């Protein structure tokens, strides 16, 4: 759950670090997420991205939504077998400051949501 955040109230260090990481993206929309991190939404090369920064300006992660067909085939196969009874809610490509690049697949079954994080190889990391 996030709420619209006025750009004037985003800490200067957060804006500076966003601008350093994404120098050509000067007009993001800012939200604050459930963890009190600042989320910048912006478009780059026609793709919508969300970049999260802590209140002290540290970059946490950048993510964008993709379709199942855009997942590596090995991950599609795992979803089709191991999670065949689940419905896919959302799929994201994520680059995280600690975990590096991975795919976050949010699935649901009987009202219970869970995230499964995959490396490109298909290894599950959470």
Give, region by region, the residue ranges found by the protein language model:
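Bacterial Sec-dependent N-terminal signal peptides
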Residues: 1-10, 18
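A short, surface-exposed beta-strand/turn
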Residues: 49-60, 114-126
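Hydrophobic/anchoring residues in structured secondary elements
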Residues: 30-32, 64, 91-93
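Long, charged/polar, surface-exposed segments that mediate recognition or autoinhibition
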Residues: 58-85
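Exposed beta-strand-loop-beta-strand "reactive/processing" segments of non-cytosolic proteins
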Residues: 26-50, 99-115
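Flexible "stalk/tail and boundary" regions
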Residues: 5, 80-81, 86-96, 100-103, ...
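Post-signal peptide N-terminal segment of mature Sec-exported envelope proteins
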Residues: 12-28
């Amino acid at each position: 759950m996030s709420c619209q955040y006025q750009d004037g109230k985003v800490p200067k260090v957060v804006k500076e670090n966003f601008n350093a990481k994404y120098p050509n993206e000067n007009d993001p929309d800012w939200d604050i997420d459930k963890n009190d991190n600042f989320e910048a939404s912006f478009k780059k090369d026609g793709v919508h991205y969300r970049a999260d920064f802590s209140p002290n300006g540290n970059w946490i992660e950048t993510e964008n939504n993709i379709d199942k067909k855009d997942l590596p085939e090995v991950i599609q196969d795992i979803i089709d077998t191991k999670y065949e009874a689940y419905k896919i809610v959302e799929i994201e490509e994520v680059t995280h400051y600690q975990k590096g690049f991975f795919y976050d697949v949010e699935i649901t079954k009987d009202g219970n949501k869970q995230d499964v994080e995959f490396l490109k190889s298909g290894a599950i990391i959470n």
